[in-house]
Amino acid sequence: MALTKDSKKAIVEKFARFAGDTGSPEVQVAILTHEINELNEHLQTHIHDFHSKRGLFMKIGRRRNLLKYLREQDAQRYAALINELGLRR
């Protein structure tokens, strides 16, 4: 369920703006997107897991806020991230 060190490291390396960048909105959104996708798969088989469903909604809200911030700060980076992650915005 949780991200492994290797998968998180791969995501950070792919979306980092510079070496050692773990806090930029792009990296945070990419990690949240991966976690959201994993939770969606979990909830497909465990429909009545309401605790995980609440966690999913919280992660979606956090990602929405980060995307809103990125869109306001730099629209080009926002558009590139949306295209790369395959989000439908």
Swiss-Prot record:
A GO biological process of this protein is: translation
Check the UniProt entry and state the signal peptide residues, or none: none
Q: Does the keyword Manganese apply?
A: no
SUPFAM superfamilies to which the protein is assigned, alphabetical:
S15/NS1 RNA-binding domain
In terms of domain of life, where is this protein from?
Bacteria
Please state which protein family the record places this protein in. Answer: Belongs to the universal ribosomal protein uS15 family.
User: What's this protein's function?
Assistant: One of the primary rRNA binding proteins, it binds directly to 16S rRNA where it helps nucleate assembly of the platform of the 30S subunit by binding and bridging several RNA helices of the 16S rRNA.
Q: What's the name of the protein?
A: Small ribosomal subunit protein uS15
Native organism: Acholeplasma laidlawii (strain PG-8A)
Recall the taxonomic lineage recorded for the source organism. Bacteria, Bacillati, Mycoplasmatota, Mollicutes, Acholeplasmatales
Q: Which gene encodes it?
A: rpsO
